[in-house]
């Protein structure tokens, strides 16, 4: 998927939200006729849409930011962390200073370069979008969660 402009990002977001609204409206209309069953189904469907929308919208945003190729020094640190995720994981596992130095050099060199942010397998709700996972997803794309917290 390629999302290169704000208009393309807005179009894909609008499309994502529109079909979800349509489906939820249909369930809401059914609730009046078959209250208990439809209400239980509606709650399950609402949760599924909430989880799916958050994952997909975060992914679309990540694809968009990735396509801009903005230097890492102009992005929030989370984008460099995503890029160096595997290297960072190996940093702690190895006892070799040469390998650790190589990782640090990679980090320092990339800081001023145009970004090459991976987008696949970054956003996941682990089939359970709770507040902790929501915060992780928002952090992955560099957005604050303050206004969602009590």
Regions found by a protein language model. Give the residues of each.
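Charged alpha-helical initiation segments
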Residues: 1-44, 57-63, 67-68, 72-78
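Long, contiguous alpha-helical bundle segments
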Residues: 43-52
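Helix-loop junctions and short alpha-helical segments
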Residues: 46, 58-150
